[in-house]
């Protein structure tokens, strides 16, 4: 069975939205590759784009593996930590 990366990215964006300091700037599901763009609301420079690989890993634009689709909440929390965000 193929991984539905669009659904995984939608779930990732939802968990990002639970962090008060983070904002989902774009959810580009029709792009190749599809991605979520996230930024810290209080910084013009703290931002990151995240893709979902076919093997089920969330990966930043610079190649850092945030976690797997088996635990989307933890992957989103790891990005929140990297972007210096506080939990809601």
Where are these regions (language model features)?
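Short beta-strand micro-motifs enriched in acidic
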Residues: 27-29, 51-53, 83
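Short, structured protein-protein interaction patches enriched in aromatics and acidic/basic residues
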Residues: 30-44
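Intrinsically disordered, low-complexity regulatory segments enriched in Ser/Thr/Pro
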Residues: 43-69
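Negatively charged, low-complexity tracts enriched in Asp/Glu with abundant Ser/Thr
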Residues: 1-34, 65-66
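Hydrophobic beta-strand residues in large extracellular and virion-surface proteins
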Residues: 24, 36-38, 50
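Generic N-terminal initiation segments characterized by hydrophobic and/or small/turn-forming residues
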Residues: 6, 43, 76-80
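Ampiphathic alpha-helical segments that act as solvent-exposed interaction surfaces
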Residues: 64-88
């Amino acid at each position: 069975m193929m991984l539905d990366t669009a659904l995984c990215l939608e779930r990732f964006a939802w968990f990002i939205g639970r962090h008060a300091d983070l904002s989902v700037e774009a959810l580009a599901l029709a792009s190749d590759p599809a991605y979520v763009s996230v930024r810290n609301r209080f910084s013009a420079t703290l931002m990151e784009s995240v893709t979902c690989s076919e093997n089920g890993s969330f990966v930043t634009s610079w190649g850092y593996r945030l976690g797997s689709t088996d635990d989307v909440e933890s992957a989103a929390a790891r990005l929140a930590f990297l972007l210096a965000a506080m939990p809601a």
